[in-house]
Amino acid sequence: MNHIAALPVGGATPLLQLRAVKKRFVQPVDLAGRLANLLGANNQASVVHAVAGVDLEIHAGEVIGVVGESGCGKSTLGRVVADISPASAGEVRYRGQRLQDMSASQRRAYALGVQMIFQNPMASLNPRMRVLDIIGEAPVVHGIVSAARKAEYVADLMRQVGLDADYGQRYPHQFSGGQRQRIGIARALALKPQLIVCDEAVAALDVSIQAQVLNLFLELRREFDLTYLFISHNLGVVGHVSDRVVIMYLGRVVEIAPTETVFSSPNHPYTQALLAELPGLETRRRTYQPIQGELPSPLRPPSGCTFHPRCPHAMSRCRTEAPVLRMLAPGHSSACHLNDVKENLQ
């Protein structure tokens, strides 16, 4: 694992803090349901709890990995952090100040200071714009650089992300997938952010290109003292870049720990299952071990511990009572009733 430990300074205010953050989406009644209502049915809108009460602190200079299967709420969490999709409840604090209490100018500064890199670089880049404008338009609009220095500014950024500066007049379709993702990275860097949310930023790339882009993220972190929230369904990818790892399942954090701890001493059965899916030389495992069962619908999450239908260690308590995150060791917390059983046996 080629990451650099970034240990929070004791007592230091986190760069970003989430407190009981929730994000709900309302799914309206479809046409068939509305027609049925005319005949006396009582179909009602459904509520999806995409993020169901997340607490998290991110300190300046560290990389937090967020891992989970598709549909677990990790991308929604990233959009909440980037203020693309505001939280339905809870608090988001930036340098100790609540977003709700910020003035309009402070909120704009936050929007510039927290940038997002998306999974599909082709879909996130305007196909009608040249790279010079894709990267350089926003910093000119926000007064970061003058229009006269735009071309020079963009050329420097392109070189920093490993692109030929002479390609500024090209369009996105004239680049490979890895090059397009580098354009997206340069666009984020152009606004001089403090925190970058990387949402499956290498998932659409070939494995060989993934390694190059991951190493680029690490180099840029060292050069610009960046902070990352790195979202991925692949625990192996997150392990390559992260200082701490957050495991999410159906909108909730089930485990959070230093990266080394997650790989050497995972506590939650879901974390253990994610690790079992990873083929690797370290474990001498040659067969793929998928997680049993299907991810439940967030429209109808299971009662109690939402992982219990797929958990090989589920007890009767797991079906009725939702576990809470509890600290097992400094920096390591897990939400599993098995920890109570282990404690009672000691």
Stretches with model-predicted labels:
Residues 190-194:
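A short, proline-enriched helix->beta-strand linker immediately N-terminal to the Walker B motif
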Residues 90-98:
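Conserved ABC transporter NBD signature motif
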Residues 33-39, 98, 149-166, 275-276:
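Conserved ABC ATPase "signature" region
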Residues 3-4, 8-14, 27-42, 258-346:
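Short catalytic/signature loops enriched in Gly
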Residues 42-43, 99-115, 133, 141, ...:
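ABC ATPase NBD coupling module
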Residues 197, 201-205, 209-286:
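P-loop NTP-binding/switch modules centered on Walker-like glycine-rich loops
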